[in-house]
């Protein structure tokens, strides 16, 4: 549920969402994950009903920034996996995440250059990116992996900025608050992807804040989702922007931030709900757990 102003209530079998004069009833049995983005009113009894039925609830700011989650008790009962997670040697996991994050971006850029034209790249730019990818195997410190992965991400977003209309004023990926609609759209998509990853991580009894390449409250989630952003979010966001479907009346710029209007948010929810591959994410968590138990070698599954 995105936007603002929805009223959400429930009975024992259904939740009812009233938003802008429209009423939608959803059977609770059809839900496994309920994502709330933006400011809405939800009854505490509805939260109770959802959690009792095993539904994972995620909360994000209006721009997609993850805030937190509510999970049923059995999502976090077992500590065995978290102990394995925290005692595992981090380097091989960090290397796998950095390697796939970089390669996925290089592949995406090559695809854009093939479809749109090589003029989107400056001379030698692709060689620099592939050189960074080759350097990874020679690095012995996780801090070095993190630095190179960030450099590639920065270059990647600068190249993406050349694919879309300059009227959107997007030059690079920035931190909050987002002042242009492109950063706002990326952030919204990443919030949805983050929520899907967090649900899978918590469902696997892992600690979302204990990562191997990244640091912070969502470190493990970031480790994984950075590998999937180009295919699951960016590709579809760029397609949406290049299609001309985002008009100037679809967003509002203020001196503080860029606000996407509800009709754009609804379209993005529909777009990214189809592009985020939850089955793949769940399988990835299984692979990680098997690796932590010594039953398999860790690798990132490609979308």
UniProtKB/Swiss-Prot annotation:
Coiled coil: none
Pfam families: Cas_Cas1
EC number: 3.1.-.-
InterPro entries assigned to the protein according to its UniProt record, in alphabetical order: Cas1, CRISPR-assoc_Cas1, CRISPR-assoc_Cas1_C, CRISPR-assoc_Cas1_N
Subunit structure as annotated in this protein's UniProt entry: Homodimer, forms a heterotetramer with a Cas2 homodimer.
Protein family per UniProt: Belongs to the CRISPR-associated endonuclease Cas1 family.
The protein's name in its UniProt record: Putative CRISPR-associated endonuclease Cas1 2
Species classification: Archaea, Methanobacteriati, Methanobacteriota, Stenosarchaea group, Methanomicrobia
């Amino acid at each position: 549920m995105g936007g603002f102003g929805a009223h959400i209530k429930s009975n024992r079998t259904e939740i009812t969402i009233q938003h802008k004069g429209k009423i939608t009833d959803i059977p609770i049995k059809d839900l496994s994950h309920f994502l709330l983005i933006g400011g809405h009113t939800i009854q505490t009894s509805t939260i109770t009903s959802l959690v009792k039925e095993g539904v994972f609830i995620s909360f994000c700011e209006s721009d997609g920034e993850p805030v937190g989650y509510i999970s049923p008790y059995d999502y976090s009962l077992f500590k065995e996996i978290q102990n394995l997670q925290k005692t595992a040697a981090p380097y091989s996991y960090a290397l796998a995440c950095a390697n796939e994050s970089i390669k996925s971006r290089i592949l995406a850029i090559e695809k854009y250059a093939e479809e749109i034209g090589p003029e989107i790249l400056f001379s030698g730019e692709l060689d620099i990116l592939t050189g960074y990818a080759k350097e990874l195997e020679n690095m012995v410190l996780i801090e070095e992996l993190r630095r190179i992965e960030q450099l590639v991400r920065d270059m990647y977003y600068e190249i993406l900025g050349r694919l879309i209309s300059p009227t959107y004023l997007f030059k690079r990926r920035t931190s909050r608050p987002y002042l242009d609609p492109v950063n706002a759209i990326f952030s919204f998509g990443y919030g949805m992807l983050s929520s899907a990853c967090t649900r899978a991580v918590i469902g696997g009894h892992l600690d979302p804040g204990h990562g191997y390449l990244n640091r912070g409250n969502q470190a493990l989630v970031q480790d994984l989702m950075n590998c999937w952003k180009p295919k699951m979010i960016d590709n579809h966001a760029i397609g949406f922007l290049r299609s001309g479907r985002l008009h100037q009346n679809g967003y509002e710029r203020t001196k503080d931030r860029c606000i996407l209007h509800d009709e754009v948010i609804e379209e993005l929810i529909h777009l990214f709900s189809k592009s985020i591959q939850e089955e793949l994410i769940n399988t990835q968590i299984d692979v990680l757990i098997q690796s932590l138990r010594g039953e398999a070698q860790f690798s990132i599954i490609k979308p």
